[in-house]
C-alpha cells in the first residue's frame, strides 16, 4: 500500500445492483420484490408502525401525560420564610428542623427553597438549595453549606 494510491480492501466494495435488466441478470422481471402484494407495488414501503390496516400499537396504547423518572431524588423541602422561627446564628439541619417541629415528615435529604424573606442569620446545612435561597441566606448574614458531594 502506498499513500499516493490508496485502494479499498478486496471484497469490501460491491457492485451496484442493476434491477429490471432481464432474467439472466438475476434481478429481472419483478426486480426482487416477489410476485404480488403491497410490498411489491410502487410507493412502498409502508410507514413505520403500519400494521396492515389494523389499529396500530401507538394508537391502542393510551396517551400518558408524563413518565416517572427511575432514579428521581426525593427531597424534604422547606422555604426560606419558614426559617425565621429559628434563633439567630443557630445551625439548620434536617435533624434540628425535625426537633423544632418545623418539619414533620422526613422524605429524604433537605432542600431549601427561596420562597419568603429571611431576617435571621443562620448556618444552613442542606443537601441542596435553589440559588435564590442561597442568596437570601447569605444576604441575611448567614452561611450555606452543602452536605452532598
UniProtKB/Swiss-Prot annotation:
Keywords: Ribonucleoprotein, Ribosomal protein, RNA-binding, rRNA-binding. GO terms for biological process: translation. Residues 23-35 have a biased composition (Gly residues). GO terms for molecular function: rRNA binding; structural constituent of ribosome. Residues 1-57 are annotated as: Disordered. PROSITE patterns: RIBOSOMAL_L15. The keyword Protein biosynthesis does not apply. Gene3D superfamilies: 3.100.10.10. The keyword Cell inner membrane does not apply. InterPro entries: Ribosomal_uL15, Ribosomal_uL15/eL18, Ribosomal_uL15/eL18_sf, Ribosomal_uL15_bac-type, Ribosomal_uL15_CS. SUPFAM superfamilies: Ribosomal proteins L15p and L18e (SSF52080). It comes from the Bacteria. One of its GO terms (cellular component) is cytosolic large ribosomal subunit. Binds to the 23S rRNA. HAMAP family: Ribosomal_uL15 (MF_01341). Belongs to the universal ribosomal protein uL15 family. Part of the 50S ribosomal subunit. PANTHER family: 50S RIBOSOMAL PROTEIN L15, LARGE RIBOSOMAL SUBUNIT PROTEIN UL15M. This is Large ribosomal subunit protein uL15.
